[in-house]
Structure formats: C-alpha cells, structure tokens
C-alpha cells in the first residue's frame, strides 16, 4: 500500500514543465500598436536568454526597419543570420535538448524563418542602396525556401525571385533579372507585377498582417501546428500626390503557406521518439511502483528504485516541441510597380482597413535615371 501511495505522490512530477523564453509578449505589444513596449521586452530577453538571441534580433530588426533605422536593422538581421546558419554540434549547449525541453537549445528558426531573414536582409539593403548585398539576401531567401537539412525542394516564394531579379537589374545583370521574373511569373501568372511588360521606376513592398503562430499539440505537446491569421485589407492603394497610382498586388507571398509546406506539400513535424518514450516510461514506472508490494526483500527495493528511475527519466526526457517563433512576421508580402516622373512626390500607402505602422505618407525623390524602393507594413 505504501508503494501505491508513493506512485500517486510522484504523479504531479510528471506534469512538471520547465519554462522557456519566447516572444509572445513582444508580438502582442507589437500588434496592439505599442512598438516601444515590444522593444523593451526584447531588450530584457536579449539580456536574459543568449540561446534565443537570433530570434530576438530578428524581432528587433523588424521594429527598426519600420522605424527607418536601416543601419540598425541591417546589423540585427546580419547577426541573426550568422547564428541561424551555424551548424549545431554536440556541444554542452546542444546536449540539453536531447534529454531536456526541445526549446532549451539555441534558436535557429524553421526554414521559412531563415528564408524571411534573407528576405529582410534584401529589403533593408535595397533601401540602403547596397544592391549586391540585397541580391545576396534574396538569394538566401530562395535557398532556405528550397532546402532543409539536406532535402531539396522547389522554392515557391515568388516575391524573393522578383526582388532578386530587381536587385540584379540594378547591378546590370539583365540575364538574372529576366530569369527571375520568368520564374515569379510561372509561380503566380495572374500577378501583373510579374509580367514582362510591367515596368516602372517605383517599387513598393508591403508586408501585410500578422504571420503564423506556432503551437504545440498532442499528448505531450510533441506536434507542431501553425495557426493562420488571415485578416488583411481587401485593398491597399498606392497614392502619389493625392492621385491613386495603383493597388498593391497579391504576389504569392503567403508566409503561412511557406511555414506549412515544403515544395508545395503540406507537412507536420512530430517529435515521435521522445513522445513514445515519455508515455512508455511513465506507464512502466508507475506500474512497477504499484506492483512493488508483491515483491519481498531485495526484489521490493529493486522494484521501487526501477519505478522511480523510469518516472524520473520520463520527466527529464521532454517531448514538447519548440514553439518559439518569429512573431512580427507578416502574413503576406505584397508588391507594386509603377512609374512616376522625375522629381519630388508625396507617396501614401492607404489600406481599405487597418493601419500603416509608423508612417503612411512619405516624400520621395525620383531620379531622372534609376528607381526608388518604398517599404511599408500594414497591420489590422
């Protein structure tokens, strides 16, 4: 009977879970229109959790990009990129993830997050006028959307192709520009921005809405699922000097789609091995403790030790999936290309619903030769 009581006493330990750092509070503050609060949270996380540094730098990079601090955004995205592309070894920092919580390791992101890091590096460098680095960033976005841990897929993130081609055109590489534009057009044939006849000296990049939320499901939280936030404006107008120039277009930049597919095929990631062991060890440990009364002498002691060992191992082998994710990503990347006469123009980004983060209107100077890139973020 005493052994049965002991079995019941250790049951609460099975439910014990180690807390992990994440950026949930950052995302909530950001989408409520409180970027200063989001920035404060990120400062605290950067101080407290070195293992999540790449995640926090990416989140902060988005805030800096929207605030027009392109140099700061560049530094954050570059450092995050260096961490995310590093190959994990069996160091003491990584071994904890084998027997501990899945989130207790260095955050390097899912393939779609690595791809979006490359996308943002490209956007920032376009805005800074560093076109070779911009092209490299978009090339990275294409690469990480098409490969993962040795597996090869076909990149289907059309904006990355268009923007790599655009940066290549700025560098005088017409061959890459034509090839990338053709690939983007093949992916989204209905998007006017990808048609060869669409030309212009103004390119507008608009990140729209809220990106996917990563959650854990399953008996032990071992399954990863992504929750979509589909709310977005029905229309986003580009207005120049008080006159509508055109509408920003859906251009195959669905981030939820990128998160949940590989080469267009839906996938689910499950940490099955840990989950199976955890369930089996819990059941075997509790059963052994309950049956310990049936043994005598040394057998009874051995049964107790074995039962406790199994239960403790089930506690420390954590099956929970890592749900840390980049909360400030958009749900969609939209694009526009049009033509303005050389000189100064006031440009407004006007969504049918929602709001433009930080700045909805800005004055630009269109050169006699060359083009201008504008970036905006629209939130609901």
What are these regions (language model features)?
Residues 15-37, 46:
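Bacterial Sec signal peptide processing site at the extreme N-terminus
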Residues 20, 55, 116, 150-152, ...:
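Start-of-helix register in tetratricopeptide repeats
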Residues 24, 59, 63-66, 113-120, ...:
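"A position-specific structural signal for the A-helix of alpha-solenoid helical repeats
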Residues 41, 76, 83, 137, ...:
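Alpha-helical solenoid repeat scaffolds, predominantly canonical TPR units
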Residues 44-51, 84-109, 145-154, 191-194:
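Flexible helix-coil transition and linker loops at the boundaries of alpha-helical arrays
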Residues 178, 186, 198-380:
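Short loop/turn and low-complexity linker motifs enriched in small/turn-promoting residues
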